[in-house]
Swiss-Prot record:
The name this protein goes by in its record: 3-hydroxyacyl-[acyl-carrier-protein] dehydratase FabZ
Gene name in the database record: fabZ
Protein's UniProt keywords contain Zinc: no
Species per Swiss-Prot/TrEMBL record: Streptococcus suis (strain 98HAH33)
EC number: 4.2.1.59
SUPFAM superfamilies the UniProt entry points to: Thioesterase/thiol ester dehydrase-isomerase
Length: 140
């Protein structure tokens, strides 16, 4: 398990953009992390005031950060950054609301030089909330 302090060492994100609370499982090419979604998230002020729903784009950002923790924790990538290069086949299946625990899985399926492709999914209570293929570049 990787706690929030180690996550903050790996990722350059700060509040309110740090969207990974804990890593539950990690292997060479796969990572499982969680985000506790609370009513105190700043985006709920405007999305939507009377019906708070986590924006889908932030779910995808949380998935990208999950993959980033795995990649940036590697010795050869310390001090580098991960940049979005693309998203494909993104689907949103379930609304994510305050009180949900978002379980995020990212699996690296292809690497070529500084480019990586990840299959990612986010679930709430075992039900798929979002999924997609993320492409990113590692750089500084």
């Amino acid at each position: 398990m990787i706690d929030i302090l180690k996550i903050k060492e790996a990722l350059p994100h700060l509040y309110p953009m740090l969207l990974v609370d804990r890593v539950l499982e990690v292997s060479e090419d796969e990572i499982v992390a969680l985000k506790n979604v609370t009513i105190n998230e700043p985006f709920f002020n405007g999305h939507f005031p009377d019906y708070p729903v986590m924006p889908g784009v932030l779910i995808m950002e949380a998935l990208a950060q999950t993959a980033g923790v795995l990649e940036l924790s590697k010795e050869e990538n310390k001090g580098k950054l991960v940049f979005y290069a693309g998203m494909d086949k993104v689907k949103f299946k379930k609304q994510v609301v305050p009180g949900d625990q978002l379980i995020m899985t990212a699996k690296f399926v292809k690497r070529r030089g500084t480019i990586a492709v990840v299959e990612a999914k986010a679930e709430v209570e075992g039900k798929l909330a979002a999924s997609g293929t993320l492409t990113f570049a590692i750089g500084k």
